[in-house]
Amino acid sequence: MSNTQNPNIHCSFCGKSQDDVKKMIAGSDVYICNECIELSTRILEEELKEEQDSEMLEVKTPKEMFDHLNEYVIGQEKAKRALAVAVYNHYKRINFTASKIAEDIELQKSNILLIGPTGSGKTFLAQTLAKSLNVPFAIADATSLTEAGYVGEDVENILLKLLQASDFNIERAEHGIIYIDEIDKIAKKSENVSITRDVSGEGVQQALLKIIEGTVASVPPQGGRKHPNQEMIQIDTKNILFIVGGAFDGIEEIVKQRLGEKIIGFGANNKKLSDEDSYMQEIIAEDIQKFGLIPEFIGRLPIVAALERLTEEDLIQILTEPKNALIKQYKQLLLFDNVELEFKDGALMAIAKKAIERKTGARGLRSIIEEVMMDIMFEVPSHEEITKVIITEAVIDGKAEPEMIREADKK
């Protein structure tokens, strides 16, 4: 291309002559003036900005996320707040990176560690958040993972689950959330948690480190072990949010020991927790390291949130209040057969007590109700005369049968 001085030449786009513009660029039988070039550049820049803006994720505020969690999750206020802020900052970071506002600033990922007893709602919290954000979500069990050379799953199979959840849309998967449960089980095998650490467990932690901190991983599309000549899917994990959780049974003793030593060494100015207080809320990185997680792994999980053990009152609320409350679900199932279902207060309390006795927390509630409801749901559809079923405390304890009210009984 070149500039030309022929006054008879006109711009092929706007029609202006050589004399009306500063520059005229010649191509193969076409000409374009400097004004059209400037206009085209502005149009391209605007279109690129629109594309960039469309790539930015719509992020709910921490308050909006917290309110959404409150609709489904009872209690755990501190954990819900910590999660909402961490998730908000994570997706704000992705948008910040996409906007290229400040290329000289690098924001680190806010991966999260949830510590709490079985059935306290760790998995459900992560699942509910992902659903509210409309991002792909996958759950993995750390106990099924092994390092290279051992029988078991490669850590890359976690990413395969996320790809499957996103219908193999790699771009969506790269903005998803992965929850890894039972992370405490790869920390140790010995009961003496402060001295011995399981070697293969440490190997799994090392393998997880790479994908958690951000890397381009090769994922076998069919799962299983990787082998030569197998086609791989490349997925960048730098924008995937990892939430890991575990019960960390016994970590309270490590916290007690640390706090006790401080009191002996520095006098009464240090805080001493009473038996009623939750030591879980006092956990720091040092305690988690003593439990058996390696420092590098802990360093990739900057947000630590402790969940409290659920009380009877919490479990009763879980049964009755959330949008997806189990009692509401069972009532609706029977309502499809025009039958009213009533759980007496004593029955709800008995269900909660059983869950606490079994140490299953909220996740054990459904199985307790199923034990009672199975026969009812089997019989009711065959008896059109039944209009109401009443469940009492004695029914839950196996000492009585459910009360069935029939149409004839009302007359």
UniProtKB/Swiss-Prot annotation:
Q: Where is the ClpX-type ZB domain?
A: 1-52
Alphabetically ordered keywords of this record:
ATP-binding, Chaperone, Metal-binding, Nucleotide-binding, Zinc
What is the primary gene name for this protein?
clpX
Some GO term, biological process aspect, for this entry: which one? cell division
- UniProt cross-references to SMART domains, sorted A to Z: AAA, ClpB_D2-small, zf-C4_ClpX
Role description: ATP-dependent specificity component of the Clp protease. It directs the protease to specific substrates. Can perform chaperone functions in the absence of ClpP.
The UniProt entry, under SUPFAM superfamilies, shows: Glucocorticoid receptor-like (DNA-binding domain), P-loop containing nucleoside triphosphate hydrolases
Protein known as: ATP-dependent Clp protease ATP-binding subunit ClpX
Regarding protein family, the annotation reads:
Belongs to the ClpX chaperone family.
One Pfam family cited in the UniProt record for this chain: AAA_2
Complexes and interactors: Component of the ClpX-ClpP complex. Forms a hexameric ring that, in the presence of ATP, binds to fourteen ClpP subunits assembled into a disk-like structure with a central cavity, resembling the structure of eukaryotic proteasomes.
Q: Which residues bind Zn(2+)?
A: C11, C14, C33, C36
**At which positions is ATP bound?**
P117, T118, G119, S120, G121, K122, T123, F124
Q: Which GO terms describe its molecular function?
A: ATP binding; ATP hydrolysis activity; ATP-dependent protein folding chaperone; protein dimerization activity; unfolded protein binding; zinc ion binding
Tree of life domain: Bacteria
What CDD domains does UniProt report for this protein, alphabetically?
A: RecA-like_ClpX
InterPro entries associated with the record: AAA+_ATPase, ATP-dep_Clp_protease_ClpX, ATPase_AAA_core, Clp_ATPase_C, Clp_protease_ATP-bd_su_ClpX, ClpX_bact, P-loop_NTPase, Znf_CppX_C4
